[in-house]
Amino acid sequence: MQPRVLLVAALLVLLASARALEAEDPSLLDLMQGYMQHATKTAQDTLTSVQESQVAQRARDWMTDGFSSLKDYWSTFKGKFSGFWDSASEAQTTPASDAS
């Protein structure tokens, strides 16, 4: 009788350990799914950050180019009309000096 009792006890132990492993498998699966979701989110955040950085860089370049062009236009405008302004201011001061 003792061999049968030992056999039944061994089977019960194996059955209990199999159930314990089954209980651990879903939690291991949950851990892996959580890890994969975290890794996916991290990769997406990094990609978004890089894309936003590239967009921001393009915007900065566009603004710099725009201000540079505006400065060039202003310099050209000043260059063309500075002679006119200088001669106009001289013309205004000349009649006053002639009258005295």
From Swiss-Prot:
It comes from Mirounga angustirostris. GO terms for biological process: cholesterol homeostasis; lipid catabolic process; lipid transport; lipoprotein metabolic process; negative regulation of high-density lipoprotein particle clearance; negative regulation of low-density lipoprotein particle clearance; negative regulation of triglyceride catabolic process; negative regulation of very-low-density lipoprotein particle clearance. Residues 1-23 form the signal peptide. It is found in: Secreted. The gene is APOC3. GO terms for molecular function: high-density lipoprotein particle receptor binding; lipase inhibitor activity; phospholipid binding. This is Apolipoprotein C-III. The keyword Lipid metabolism applies. Glycans are attached at T94. InterPro entries: Apo-CIII, Apo_CIII_sf. Keywords: Chylomicron, Glycoprotein, Lipid degradation, Lipid metabolism, Lipid transport, Secreted, Sialic acid, Signal, Transport, VLDL. Belongs to the apolipoprotein C3 family. Residues 68-100 are annotated as: Lipid-binding. The record marks K41 as: May interact with the LDL receptor. One of its GO terms (cellular component) is intermediate-density lipoprotein particle. Component of triglyceride-rich very low density lipoproteins (VLDL) and high density lipoproteins (HDL) in plasma. Plays a multifaceted role in triglyceride homeostasis. Intracellularly, promotes hepatic very low density lipoprotein 1 (VLDL1) assembly and secretion; extracellularly, attenuates hydrolysis and clearance of triglyceride-rich lipoproteins (TRLs). Impairs the lipolysis of TRLs by inhibiting lipoprotein lipase and the hepatic uptake of TRLs by remnant receptors. The most abundant glycoforms are characterized by an O-linked disaccharide galactose linked to N-acetylgalactosamine (Gal-GalNAc), further modified with up to 3 sialic acid residues. Less abundant glycoforms are characterized by more complex and fucosylated glycan moieties. O-glycosylated on Thr-94 with a core 1 or possibly core 8 glycan.
